């Protein structure tokens, strides 16, 4: 009887041990430790996290940026961070935290902004985001930066969020998209309030000396292609993983996509820069990236 009891006890302990091992190895955002936010991590002896300055070509012109490379040999899933207009809020606090969670993060300035060559335009910036993917998926750059080219995501704020959606929805190499306070020209620049929005944008662009940009041409180019910037329609035709967190009501129609497994639209009570929600925003983004790029059960 004692022998039988010992065998049963051994089997139960073994099952619990195996289950715990399986749980520890499975990427699950609900169980991810937040140590990456709370504590400094011990660097890998041979492949420590670092920063690499980048020069990315877009239509033959140089864009300047840098990579926050993740700790460890990799290759690592990689997030391309897309800034807004003009890019005063770079979200580098998010970049550092996302990197500490095990992701490479790429930051760059679009053509015609902050010293990058060329002319700043909305469509140009969309093309620039795709050029950044081209850069990362080049075999030499991927090896140097330890990029897992099968796990690339866009994360953008404001105008950068609109760019992330419009570029990411069309590029099969981008597996997941995060949009924070999404700038949606299709809803902002037509219908009620459009005239005021256009005037406000033009007046704001006139104050932005860090941009090589003609405000009239910038806006005229958007209006000429407005139908191609219909984010809602493009989302409806895609099964790509998308997280949108807004603090405004310009995209409330996105909520109709919430029943989809790979879509989540939320509205938070905060300001445009999410000033009082930076830690919560970090956790929300990292959990989303974990679920949609690392936890394959949640990826369609």
Label the model's feature ranges.
Residues 29-73:
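N-terminal cap/lid segment of alpha/beta-hydrolase-fold proteins
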Residues 144-158:
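Alpha/beta-hydrolase fold nucleophile elbow
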Residues 166-215:
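Hydrolase active-site cap/lid region
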């Amino acid at each position: 009887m004692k022998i039988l009891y010992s065998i049963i006890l051994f089997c139960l302990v073994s099952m619990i041990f195996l289950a715990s091992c399986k749980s520890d190895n499975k990427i699950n955002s609900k169980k991810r430790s937040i140590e990456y936010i709370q504590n400094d991590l011990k660097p890998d002896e041979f492949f420590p996290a670092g920063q690499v300055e980048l020069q990315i070509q877009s239509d033959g012109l140089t864009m300047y940026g840098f990579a926050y490379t993740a700790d460890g040999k990799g290759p690592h899933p990689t997030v391309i961070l897309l800034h807004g207009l003009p890019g005063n809020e770079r979200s580098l606090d998010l970049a550092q935290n996302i990197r500490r969670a095990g992701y490479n993060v790429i930051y760059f300035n679009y053509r015609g902004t902050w010293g990058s060559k060329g002319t700043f335009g909305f469509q140009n910036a969309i093309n620039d985001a795709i050029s950044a993917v081209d850069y990362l998926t080049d075999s030499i750059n991927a090896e140097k930066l330890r990029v897992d080219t099968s796990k690339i995501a866009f994360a953008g704020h404001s105008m950068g969020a609109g760019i992330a959606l419009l570029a990411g929805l069309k590029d099969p190499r981008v597996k997941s998209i995060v949009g924070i306070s999404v700038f949606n020209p299709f809803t902002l620049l037509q219908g009620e309030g459009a005239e005021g929005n256009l005037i406000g944008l033009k007046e704001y662009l006139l104050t932005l000396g860090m941009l090589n940009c003609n405000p009239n041409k910038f806006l005229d180019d958007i209006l000429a292609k407005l139908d191609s910037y219909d984010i809602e329609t493009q989302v409806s035709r895609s099964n790509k993983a998308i997280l949108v967190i807004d603090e405004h009501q310009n995209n409330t129609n996105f909520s109709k996509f919430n029943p989809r497994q790979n879509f989540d639209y939320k509205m938070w009570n905060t300001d445009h820069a999410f000033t009082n929600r930076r830690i919560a925003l970090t956790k929300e983004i990292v959990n989303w990236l974990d679920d949609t790029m690392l936890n394959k059960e949640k990826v369609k």
